[in-house]
């Protein structure tokens, strides 16, 4: 029963052929030196592990337990299936001899590094390669390949490896080895002499005493688990970075890592010119241009170009959030989100703008911010040509064209394109005004409105027009003003064809056609089509005059009246008649004046049908009928 328990797991041991990867000569020619080096290291590691497991070497068609790996087979392992042609050889970079196989080259080059020749412990004969040494040793002891599971069990339970450095030393004869796989084979050669033990005895002692691995005290109940652990210990991280001290198991991994310090990015995309440190990163990037997304989610069918992205996405369906913040307990689906979140607690802002010194938590936030300095607006609306610095702003803008308003007020049914506007609107119904001006005590529903209002008292106008020098208290006023110079009126009324510079102005105008007056005064019940009109009207009840002239201290109920009044002191007359050149301080005065040239008389008397140029003239005339 114990013996069966031990041998069962071994049935799943793989051979070298199961894990080997082959290239055609055409594919092999496309690899750079670093990739060939990596392939070389990986194949040697795979060969070492399959040999330690007792699996067959390259090209072995027999079952793993029916034949051990001979030294000749190990030294003759091929790289690509198309590679072992006699015409295809590998030159030694030091002395120039041409060797037919990759592993022959490895053993040959070991002689250039001061390694010992392999010596037979019995007759002290020196041989250059371990393959020849093992062939020679068979002449002394008449060894044959072990075929019983008992022999394999004893081999696995008696091997002790030195993992502290190279070369590897056999404790039976004191012989040194350069290649790990040769060391494993030497150990197997010694254990074959002890094959008189039975499988049941091995099983009994193996169950009673768990397998222990050299200096590592970790214990295992099954051989295949122990051997896997041994493989991890064999993979010594012998390549260390001189910059940061980080170690790697292969020279290629170290080469890739060194590019972090040198900033070298040798792999460039032919489509967009973007460069990468590793060829695998370039291959993944190219899928953006080709549209290839080979990894599909079984739950929703969504496609991904990287397997890692698919694994992260699948956590949306499973609800898995394995990364937990130790500060607040919040969990995340991937580690990068946790790292970014932890910056909230530490206050770290690693991404700094080189222009203004402002720092950010996310690199994406820095990229977006830098567009303020460069003026880049990569996201353009296909309907009106307006461009935006962020994609989210373009998405919101598109709703204006399609009439989409995803945010609906439950009180009045009004739809809003932006969530912020929706929240602002809800305060109309609730009456919440939590932001108070310390100068005049006025309340505002938004802090931003309070900040803009305070500039009335301070006189601050930080936003100046580069065309005419006019300044404004908030940026939105400046943006609106710019359209005076550009003449842009992208918003057109479907009823009368009139166009407007702002969508909000169009909405207000459309109420002229619909007759809608949604804003009601709580004092007198009067309705208004615009909220600003209601606000101005309320001041007639309260007597509030928040806008004060700094010259004569006269106050006004609305800002536009103050602006008009200031022109009395400055003498400014910005509105000029194109017919006679006469200028006016108010646009309404210019409109009335232009009727003199056009002959327009829009005001009609309802009693006699007479027309007048000005409303004031009509009012005077109506007194005639009243008698």
Curated annotation (Swiss-Prot):
Gene Ontology BP terms: negative regulation of DNA-templated transcription; regulation of transcription by RNA polymerase II
Compartment list: Nucleus
Family annotation (Pfam families): KRAB (PF01352), zf-C2H2 (PF00096), zf-C2H2_15 (PF23561)
Zinc finger residue ranges, C2H2-type: 90-112, 239-261, 267-289, 295-317, 323-345, 351-373, 379-401, 407-429, 435-457, 463-485, 491-513, 519-541, 547-569, 575-597, 603-625
Any GO molecular function: zinc ion binding
Induction summary: By GDNF/glial cell line-derived neurotrophic factor.
Ranges of Polar residues composition bias in the record: 65-75
Record region (Disordered): 55-76
Domain notes: The KRAB domain mediates interaction with TRIM28 and is required for transcriptional repressor activity.
Similarity field: Belongs to the krueppel C2H2-type zinc-finger protein family.
Task of the protein: Transcriptional repressor that plays a role in cell proliferation. Requires TRIM28 for its activity.
Assembly and binders: Interacts with TRIM28.
Name assigned to this protein: Zinc finger protein 256
Organism name: Homo sapiens
Taxonomic classification: Eukaryota, Metazoa, Chordata, Craniata, Vertebrata
